[in-house]
Amino acid sequence: MLQPNMPAPNFSGQAVVGKEFETISLSDYKGKWVILAFYPLDFTFVCPTEIIAISDQMEQFAQRNCAVIFCSTDSVYSHLQWTKMDRKVGGIGQLNFPLLADKNMSVSRAFGVLDEEQGNTYRGNFLIDPKGVLRQITVNDDPVGRSVEEALRLLDAFIFHEEHGEVCPANWKPKSKTIVPTPDGSKAYFSSAN
């Protein structure tokens, strides 16, 4: 089972990038933060809301040197057709990140999000650092979508930690107080926070 601080499994596969099919690999993104987001199926109900929400906020991720890749077990042909559908009828339109097609289910299986019985994936979010190490893992059952705000908050927290060495308490947001991870540092935080 994958856990934080483990190397992310490398993968390579066909994706819809813009209006074209391209082969992408995790190694293409070395030196960047990556959110690898799995979703159950194209043409469903919650999935387009997540994909559109993140695509519309892609500039926020790009400013943080973060690439986003969405992945399902659908084919590139299915992905492409979905991008051609208007958002007003359940389509996703033009996206600002790749849609990876995991038709052979190898990527979903490697990341532990494949529902073997159904042949599709759970909603999984994997935050991968610029060295290719898993930093955060979240897996949801199908009915509940992800939060763009929470994805950005987690990304900001890990970037802050990498840059400053301090740790981020519950509900931390940029410019909030952090904790120097020493006995005296934590006392200073707790005395000012409580």
From Swiss-Prot:
Q: What class of enzyme is it?
A: oxidoreductase
> Keywords for this entry?
Antioxidant, Disulfide bond, Oxidoreductase, Peroxidase, Redox-active center
GO MF annotations for this entry?
Answer: thioredoxin peroxidase activity
Look up the signal peptide feature and give its range: none
* Record keyword Oxidoreductase present: yes
One Pfam family this sequence matches? 1-cysPrx_C
Domain Thioredoxin, chain residue ranges per copy = 2-160
Q: Which domain of life is it from?
A: Eukaryota
Q: What positions does UniProt annotate as the active site of this protein?
A: C47 (cysteine sulfenic acid (-soh) intermediate)
The record ties this protein, via Gene3D superfamilies, to: Glutaredoxin
Any Gene Ontology biological process: cellular response to stress
Catalytic activity entry: a hydroperoxide + [thioredoxin]-dithiol = an alcohol + [thioredoxin]-disulfide + H2O
Question: Which cellular component terms (GO) are annotated to the entry?
Answer: cytosol
Supply the EC number(s).
Answer: 1.11.1.24
Record's keyword annotation contains Cell inner membrane: no
Any other comment in the entry? Answer: The active site is a conserved redox-active cysteine residue, the peroxidatic cysteine (C(P)), which makes the nucleophilic attack on the peroxide substrate. The peroxide oxidizes the C(P)-SH to cysteine sulfenic acid (C(P)-SOH), which then reacts with another cysteine residue, the resolving cysteine (C(R)), to form a disulfide bridge. The disulfide is subsequently reduced by an appropriate electron donor to complete the catalytic cycle. In this typical 2-Cys peroxiredoxin, C(R) is provided by the other dimeric subunit to form an intersubunit disulfide.
> What's the family?
Belongs to the peroxiredoxin family. AhpC/Prx1 subfamily.
This molecule's function is given as: Antioxidant. Could be involved in protection against reactive oxygen species (ROS) generated by metabolic processes and/or protection of the parasite against ROS released by immune effector cells. Thiol-specific peroxidase that catalyzes the reduction of hydrogen peroxide and organic hydroperoxides to water and alcohols, respectively. Plays a role in cell protection against oxidative stress by detoxifying peroxides and as sensor of hydrogen peroxide-mediated signaling events.
Quaternary state and interactors? Homodimer; disulfide-linked, upon oxidation.
Q: What is this protein identified as? A: Thioredoxin peroxidase
- Source organism per entry reads Fasciola hepatica (Liver fluke)
Q: What is this organism's lineage? A: Eukaryota, Metazoa, Spiralia, Lophotrochozoa, Platyhelminthes
